[in-house]
């Protein structure tokens, strides 16, 4: 549906998903009347035992094997509207809830009068009708920018080409990031690092790739991670994961003031994205004898993670501070 002030695409109601066929990929594929084989996705998922998060690249490649084309870009609000106006429901990468790092959401419309975007919500009704959530564009963009405004365009090849989005190097670099994440989930950190480095070679300004390599180096306790996190923040100073990653590295290396500063900056960007960041900062405050601040952070940790396994220990620590 298209009017002067809004566009709204009609998406199918979908419930079936798998870690290798994430719901947004399945929804958009069905929108194009492409039925993706769930059994193939289930077979691929055996490569990821004990993993509960979505492997987006597996869903993308499954869709591509069934005739759709994909572009992964860093976008903008005007471009997002252009994509929707072209009849394509874009998939955007947004911050997750604690402690889910990220989640993908399908945007299927916008309303200029209300300055909102419409995103698909997985909620069943007896009628199976489409569920929607309206989010004010300024609030959406504040969240979206934290992960570089990553956007997945999935459509038949002729429709993708009609968009005339010419970001070939960026697209290839972003795809390599998604492949790197796949290997990281498989705990193949050597391959993950290789693909992240290739992504940076293609696009040295790709904040997603720079943060990704920073995280991989951080997991190896390499101080080289600092440079990549800092480069990521030069490209996107709202990159929450780079600030929190830097904070974690400085915590491990006992650089207390630097760690607190990075955690502060991450929390300023998004105070509800992570519970663990409050527990980490509380530990640092306690080391600096800032007990009231430590106590407040532990309360925030429990507020964001009410079912934390260490709840009893944390409650005891709060009483003792």
What are these model-derived regions, one by one?
Residues 199, 231-232, 265-267, 300-301:
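Canonical positions in the second alpha-helix
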Residues 202, 235, 269-270, 304:
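Structural marker of alpha-solenoid helical repeat scaffolds
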Residues 1-52, 96, 113, 173-183, ...:
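Active-site-adjacent structural segments surrounding the nucleophilic cysteine of cysteine proteases
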Residues 220-222:
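Glycine-centered coil turns and helix-coil junctions that link the paired helices
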Residues 110-202, 207-211:
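Noncatalytic regulatory segments and standalone regulatory/sensor domains
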Residues 1-11, 29-31, 36-155:
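Conserved active-site-adjacent core of cysteine acyl-enzyme catalytic domains
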Residues 176, 183, 195, 210-217, ...:
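TPR/Sel1-like alpha-solenoid repeat signature
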């Amino acid at each position: 549906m298209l009017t002067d002030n809004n566009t709204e695409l009609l998406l199918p109601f979908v419930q079936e998903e798998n870690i290798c066929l994430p719901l947004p990929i399945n929804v958009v594929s069905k929108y194009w009347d492409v039925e993706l084989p769930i059994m193939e996705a289930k077979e691929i998922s055996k490569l990821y035992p004990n993993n509960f998060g979505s492997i987006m690249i597996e869903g993308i490649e499954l869709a591509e094997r069934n005739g759709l084309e994909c572009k992964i870009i860093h976008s903008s609000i005007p471009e997002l509207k252009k994509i929707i106006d072209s009849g394509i429901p874009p998939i955007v990468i947004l911050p997750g809830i604690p402690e889910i790092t990220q989640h993908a959401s399908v945007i299927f419309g916008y309303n200029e009068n209300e300055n909102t975007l419409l995103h698909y919500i997985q909620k069943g009704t007896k009628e199976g009708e489409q569920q929607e959530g309206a989010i004010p564009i300024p609030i959406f963009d504040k969240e979206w920018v934290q992960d570089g405004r990553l956007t997945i365009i999935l459509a038949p090849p002729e429709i993708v080409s009609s968009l005339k989005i010419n970001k070939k190097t960026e697209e290839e670099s972003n795809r390599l990031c998604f492949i790197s994440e796949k290997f990281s989930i498989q705990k193949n950190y050597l391959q993950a690092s290789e693909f992240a480095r290739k992504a940076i070679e293609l696009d040295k300004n790709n904040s997603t790739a720079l943060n990704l390599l920073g995280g991989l180096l951080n997991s190896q306790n390499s101080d080289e991670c600092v440079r990549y996190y800092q480069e990521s923040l030069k490209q996107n100073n709202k990159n929450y994961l780079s600030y929190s990653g830097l904070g974690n590295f400085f915590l491990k290396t006992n650089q207390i003031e630097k760690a607190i500063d990075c955690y502060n900056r991450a929390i300023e960007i998004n105070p509800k994205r992570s519970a663990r960041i409050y527990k980490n900062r509380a530990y640092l405050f306690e080391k600096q004898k800032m007990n009231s601040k430590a106590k407040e952070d532990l309360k925030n940790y429990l507020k964001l993670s009410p079912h934390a396994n260490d709840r009893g220990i944390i409650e005891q620590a709060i009483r003792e501070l």
